[in-house]
Amino acid sequence: MSEQHAQGADAVTDLNNELKTRREKLASLREQGIPFPNDFRRDHTSDQLHADFDAKENEELEALNIEVSVAGRMMTRRIMGKASFVTLQDVGGRIQLYVARDDLPEGVYNEQFKKWDLGDILGAKGKLFKTKTGELSIHCTELRLLTKALRPLPDKFHGLQDQEARYRQRYLDLISNDESRNTFKVRSQIMAGIRQFMVGRGFMEVETPMMQVIPGGAAARPFITHHNALDLDMYLRIAPELYLKRLVVGGFERVFEINRNFRNEGISVRHNPEFTMMELYMAYADYKDLIELTESLFRTLAQDILGKTEVPYGDEVFDFGKPFEKLTMREAIKKYRPETDMADLDNFDSAKAIAESIGIKVEKSWGLGRIVTEIFEEVAEAHLIQPTFITEYPAEVSPLARRNDVNPEITDRFEFFIGGREIGNGFSELNDAEDQAQRFQDQVNAKEAGDDEAMFYDEDYVTALEHGLPPTAGLGIGIDRMVMLFTNSHTIRDVILFPAMRPVK
């Protein structure tokens, strides 16, 4: 047996022995009739204590004689004979406990406390003081075991190092990784901040179906499920767009939804099949109004959550404080491929030749607009590091967007890029029912030609448009990618609590 295999076998043996010992301790607690008590109540969390009392000197704390109760997980313990120091971790952070044998009821220190394990959940009561090193601590007068942990924590110095284990056992990642905990706190703050921002601008939050008879609102491959009661195949939604615009037809002039979308596509550092989007629709507005709204939203979130408008990300710093750059799609192609003759982007054969020269395989179903879009994605997208709006998307790749009044081959649409990736997509909505019907038919033709991401024909949505959709603008923002930016995370799995994973066999 190799040394590595021997070490692995020893580790398994050690773990099995520890599991056995911990279960024996739980059995003893069961015999005492109190394995999982539920009558302990705390009055503070660790962050509240630090915020209120870190600035006070020990003499002041002694004079105030403040008694508190806390609860959390025992992360470290230093036993020094008749006294010990414990680090207790709760939702707000960590607080130190000073546990002395003679300050607890008889037998608690030696017969109970010393037999507890790291990872156990404790309740503690006592008075605040500061150690000689100035650390805020609780001098315990009561200490109780609230939950016995049957499995040990990850190594306290190295945490959960295996990346896949972090995703599969997110609970361990959250216990042992301060950075991971902070990421999801920031995510929650972003969600709350978006809602506050939207409501402040007069939008109403709504919910639309997650299971749909016809998936629409985006070009993507859907998941298929079956409704037993209706004996009907249905699709998990790829976007809420068409339902939200039905609500605008119905008279709700400003609506938004934050919820999950599902796309049966690949997994990467930027893509998870199940992801969170915020979509909004605003009557009597156009895409330019949404550009202003998007800038304001990101600037507000950065200032409110991070306290600044400059957001560090890897080697870059995104500046949300200054006006975002705005380029048309063709301007972006020219900027990042200077040799491009702009006239070639107006000719199918010339554009196809450019695409093929940079390694793009042009499909038979593609028209000029799709080819130009593919060229943009290949030569320009990765260079859009600072916040940038790209406008004038071809109508061919924008089946739900309003055509431009001057050039009907393009639409009043933008996509929003930061760090070389798309974060949001917005446009003036197509409200011409006949034009929409024709574009749906074009999508059907593309699907029949082999494009499995082309949209379905949604007759009911066309009927809704025939009742009259006011001039409207719509915007979708990927929440997961937004959180990545605000938390300096470089894979989408780091900002989704439970990302899609292949089951362990």
Swiss-Prot record:
GO biological process, one term: lysyl-tRNA aminoacylation
Subcellular location per the Swiss-Prot or TrEMBL entry: Cytoplasm
Keywords: Aminoacyl-tRNA synthetase, ATP-binding, Cytoplasm, Ligase, Magnesium, Metal-binding, Nucleotide-binding, Protein biosynthesis
Cofactor: Mg(2+)
Binding site for Mg(2+) 1: E415, E422
Span of the signal peptide: none
Reactions this protein catalyses: tRNA(Lys) + L-lysine + ATP = L-lysyl-tRNA(Lys) + AMP + diphosphate
Gene3D superfamilies named in the record: Bira Bifunctional Protein, Domain 2, Nucleic acid-binding proteins
Coiled coil start-end: none
A cellular-component GO term for this protein: cytosol
GO molecular function, one term: lysine-tRNA ligase activity
Residues involved in Mg(2+) 2 binding: E422
Cofactor: record remark: Binds 3 Mg(2+) ions per subunit.
Enzyme Commission number, as recorded: 6.1.1.6
Alphabetical list of InterPro entries matching this protein: Aa-tRNA-synt_II (IPR004364), aa-tRNA-synth_II (IPR006195), aa-tRNA-synth_II/BPL/LPL (IPR045864), Lys-tRNA-ligase_II (IPR002313), Lys-tRNA-ligase_II_bac/euk (IPR034762), Lys-tRNA-ligase_II_N (IPR044136), Lys-tRNA-synth_II_C (IPR018149), NA-bd_OB-fold (IPR012340)
Description of how the protein assembles with itself and partners: Homodimer.
PANTHER family: LYSINE--TRNA LIGASE, CHLOROPLASTIC_MITOCHONDRIAL, LYSYL-TRNA SYNTHETASE
Assigned protein family: Belongs to the class-II aminoacyl-tRNA synthetase family.
Protein name as catalogued: Lysine--tRNA ligase
Species the sequence originates in: Citrobacter koseri (strain ATCC BAA-895 / CDC 4225-83 / SGSC4696)
Lineage of origin: Bacteria, Pseudomonadati, Pseudomonadota, Gammaproteobacteria, Enterobacterales
Gene behind this protein: lysS
